[in-house]
């Protein structure tokens, strides 16, 4: 898949890594108009065999009410020589008041860091690649339009969109892990955005949109939403897009073949007009009437 073009935003050097047991944080840096930092859990976050990596907003309370940032993110782990040890996948997600940080719970298998030759001098470098795709500041004016619906804060204008989902899939939100109504509402917004996306015709989907859609789907599934129907829909879109891309490629190849044949044909025609015709001896010799000697006239 094609990746979104991300920029290296920050590099963090971590010394004496194997001796780290507790969560550690980087210095603060700026991205998307926010102060950010990287959080590492050397012994994992629910998965003891993995290193966990997160990007967090440094001082979310200093931002305007209703702030949010949509961003794409990945991390690269390097050793002291600059050799790449591991690269995470690219994720696309939302930062906001209820979700000031997110990242990768299973960013890197710890077995990779047990190799002393790979982990030189017990030192790691973490490179952070970010692209902020949306910056929003929202005030409190929409709060009065919020309604409680099935444990979620929903805008009155969204009820018509949310009701059919609960009617068709009544248990789809039964297992979600967040208990805060505000956090649940953020994920519901992600769900509604994803549903709107997958309802677009497959032929107008870009690869970037598909990457973002799958990233949103992963976020929803990780917090417990039962959204297999959305995964099936996305898989159908992905397959339809692949068939279209393959068909377009075959058509391009066919046209290229026709163009090549036409070029060769034009060359042959040009050659036949330019090259002189080879003439035989007969073509050069003019016809001569046979000479017949005259007989003398007898008197």
UniProtKB/Swiss-Prot annotation:
Q: Does Zinc show up as a keyword for this record?
A: no
Query: Gene3D superfamilies annotated for this entry?
Result: Apoptosis, Tumor Necrosis Factor Receptor Associated Protein 2, Chain A
Pfam families assigned to the protein according to its UniProt record, in alphabetical order: MATH_2
Q: Which residues form a coiled coil?
A: 225-262
Superkingdom of source? Eukaryota
Output the InterPro entries linked to this UniProt entry.
MATH-CC_domain_protein, MATH/TRAF_dom, TRAF-like
Name under which the protein is recorded: MATH domain and coiled-coil domain-containing protein At2g42460
**PROSITE patterns hit by this protein:** MATH (PS50144)
Please report the organism this UniProt entry assigns to the protein: Arabidopsis thaliana
For this UniProt record, the keywords arranged alphabetically read as follows: Coiled coil
> Per the database record, which ranges form the MATH domain?
7-130
């Amino acid at each position: 898949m094609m990746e979104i073009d991300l920029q290296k935003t920050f590099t963090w050097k971590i010394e004496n890594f194997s001796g780290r047991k507790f969560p550690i944080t980087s210095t603060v840096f700026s991205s998307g108009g926010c102060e950010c930092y990287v959080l590492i859990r050397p012994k994992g976050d629910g998965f003891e065999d993995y290193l966990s990596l997160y990007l967090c907003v440094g001082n979310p309370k200093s931002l305007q009410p209703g702030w949010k940032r949509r961003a794409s993110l990945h991390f690269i782990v390097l050793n002291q020589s600059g050799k790449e040890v591991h690269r995470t996948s690219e994720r696309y997600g939302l930062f906001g008041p209820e979700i000031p940080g997110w990242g990768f719970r299973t960013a890197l298998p710890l077995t990779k860091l047990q190799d002393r030759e790979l982990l030189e001098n017990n030192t790691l470098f973490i490179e952070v690649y970010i692209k902020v795709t949306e910056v929003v500041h929202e005030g409190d004016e929409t709060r009065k339009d919020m309604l409680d619906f099935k444990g979620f804060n929903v805008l009155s204008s969204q009820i018509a969109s949310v009701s059919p989902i609960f009617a068709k899939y009544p248990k789809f939100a039964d297992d979600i892990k967040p208990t805060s109504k505000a956090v649940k509402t953020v994920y519901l917004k992600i769900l509604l955005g994803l549903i709107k996306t997958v309802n677009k015709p497959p032929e107008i989907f870009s690869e970037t949109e598909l990457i973002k859609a799958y990233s949103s789907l992963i976020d929803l599934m990780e917090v417990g939403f039962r959204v297999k129907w959305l995964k099936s829909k996305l898989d159908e879109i992905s397959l339809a897009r692949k068939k279209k891309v393959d068909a377009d490629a075959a058509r391009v190849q066919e046209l290229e073949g026709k163009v090549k044949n036409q070029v060769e044909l034009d060359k042959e025609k040009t050659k036949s007009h330019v090259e002189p015709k080879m003439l035989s001896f007969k073509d050069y010799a003019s016809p001569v009437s046979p000479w017949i000697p005259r007989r003398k006239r007898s008197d």
